[in-house]
């Protein structure tokens, strides 16, 4: 049986914890769980900074045990579909956020100079180019770049193997 588990609860921060394997070994992991934001930030930390911090943790490292889990998706309560009012105080337009942060992350890891693993990338609209629906709407045709982000992760994995000995 292969696998690992991570003990974490929803947080509005980037934090370090441990990733535990099925045979008892543990490795450090940095988690970007900045998901409930307003106007692009929470408690002074922007979503862009959270993505960058998580990627920087594994960037160019020689330590194969360094992992990150980058939760690229989020909900921006200032950009809610329902008349600008946040649903239950937490839910905003996730197609709006996917449009911004999927594209940003894809561009960052797909750049020629990027070397390193991207860790675990969690996203809304994986492999989808456009949203089909979102909260408060029956139809949304916003470009969400889920296809570009999946492609960037796959390309980076291939690029890393080819370029690590340059």
Show where each model-derived region lies:
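Catalytic cores of phosphodiester-bond hydrolases, prominently lipid phosphodiesterases
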Residues: 1-166
